Amino acid sequence: MSYLNPEILARIMPLGLRAQRVVEGSISGLHRSPLHGVSVEFANYREYAPGDDLKRLDWRAYARSNKFHIKLYEEESDLRATLLLDASASMRYGRGAMTKFQYAATLTASLAAMLIRQRDAVGLAVFDEAEQSWLRPVATQAQLAKIIDILEKAQPDRKTDLSAVMGKIASQIKRRGMVVIISDLLTDLDGFYDGLSRLQHDGHEIVIFQILDPDEIELPFQDSVLFRDIEGGASAEQLFAEPWAFRKAYKAAMETFIGEVDTRCRLAGIDHLLLRTSDDLGLAMSHYLHSRQRGA
């Protein structure tokens, strides 16, 4: 399936995603930078766009391609965002139009397109119990094509170890920026909170999109159901049960789980947004981006 949805992009592109904390970068003034007078290093090219400084046109690149290109430097991105996408087996679940992974991948692609449109650098890490793919943040159109290619090839399959992945990602991100985590968060929460603390200690702004299927929240089944640990492999535990017998207790436990994550994030100054796969993604994202603008 295509993860770039024109209707979603039309809703969110005019809004944009702005950093609410001080980040490293200083070009267009959308984000404040704590760094002034730092040295810059050539990183890449992008095609010329109206309003760009003509002094920065690369004439050699024009001679090679017959297209106008602007030189990009490492310090030129207003925001460096790294998107962490959960591709563990639990993300395969879904009885509606999309699985959790398909919904999350659509969100990832939409965020990447929006960030690159506003000339910010975006990177991607796809993970399960380890890091499957890694792209360092770059602010070019070619980066979006790479991200889409990785999303289309990703296969949610193994267990989750979000805390270990967050530790590795923290060591790979060299400069302060934004880290966006897109996951169902069905993982060890203590390790997850430790990972959040490390990222915050390193100066990153964190945004969490928690993706759940409505079934996981409501447990709507009426008939007898065989429940199976989707990340347990061939030896997964199974339970044949009548959902009505424990629906109330299950929903209370799930409400406590979601509430705890939301409270911990709020106290730490971290944005946490719960998204159900039945939610209109474009509408939910536009509401969130509007709320960030009001709170910025």
Positions of PLM-derived features:
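Short, electropositive alpha-helical surface patch
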Residues: L135-D149, H290-S291
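An amphipathic, basic-hydrophobic helix/alpha-beta surface used to engage anionic
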Residues: M1-V138, M178, I182, D188, ...
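A short, mixed-charge helix-start or loop-turn motif at secondary-structure junctions
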Residues: S90-G94, L151, P243
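Von Willebrand factor type A / integrin I
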Residues: M1-P34, V40, S171-G177, L189-A296
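Helical mechanochemical/support elements of P-loop NTPase systems and associated helical scaffolds
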Residues: K55, S77, Q143, R158, ...
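Short, contiguous clusters of charged residues that form electrostatic/catalytic patches at enzyme active sites
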Residues: T106, S110, T160-G167, D190, ...
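Von Willebrand factor
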Residues: Q143-G177, L189-D190, L212-D213, I217
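Conserved phosphate-coordination/catalytic loops
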Residues: Q102, P156-S163, L186-T187, A252-E255
